[in-house]
């Protein structure tokens, strides 16, 4: 059972600027433009570190890239669809197609560089 909801969850993930997506919202969200999706779990320490990095990058380049996150515990269907078995797992989409996938925490500079290839 997940005891964290809404504002409490966002505080815990330190990532309240990036919307958390559900199964029903996902496909429409990644359909157009460059989109970064962060697959995470609340109990994952590297995910918490990555959440801060994603927050910073989203503030910096949020007009050029859409950012979203998916809790793998709450949205197992999406995680299975994209074969997410390790977290944090970052997928970058361009117009609905995956253009990059990487696992693990990266620096803000590296994330900006990876996104820069697609914007």
Named regions from a protein language model:
Residues 2-33, 117:
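N-terminal leader/targeting and pre-domain segments
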Residues 25, 74-78, 110:
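Short acidic active-site motifs
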Residues 86, 92-119:
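Non-catalytic, surface beta->alpha helical segment in thiol-disulfide oxidoreductase systems
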């Amino acid at each position: 059972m997940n005891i964290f909801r809404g504002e409490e969850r966002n505080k815990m993930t330190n990532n309240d600027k990036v919307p958390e997506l559900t199964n029903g919202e996902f496909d429409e969200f990644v359909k157009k433009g460059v989109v970064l999706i962060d697959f995470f779990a609340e109990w994952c320490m590297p995910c918490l570190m990555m959440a801060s990095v994603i927050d910073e990058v989203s503030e910096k380049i949020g007009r050029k890239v859409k950012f979203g996150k998916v809790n793998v515990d709450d949205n197992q269907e999406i995680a299975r669809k994209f074969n997410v078995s390790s977290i944090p797992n970052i997928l970058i989409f361009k117009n609905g197609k995956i253009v990059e996938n990487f696992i693990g925490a990266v620096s803000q500079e590296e994330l900006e560089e990876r996104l820069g290839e697609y914007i």
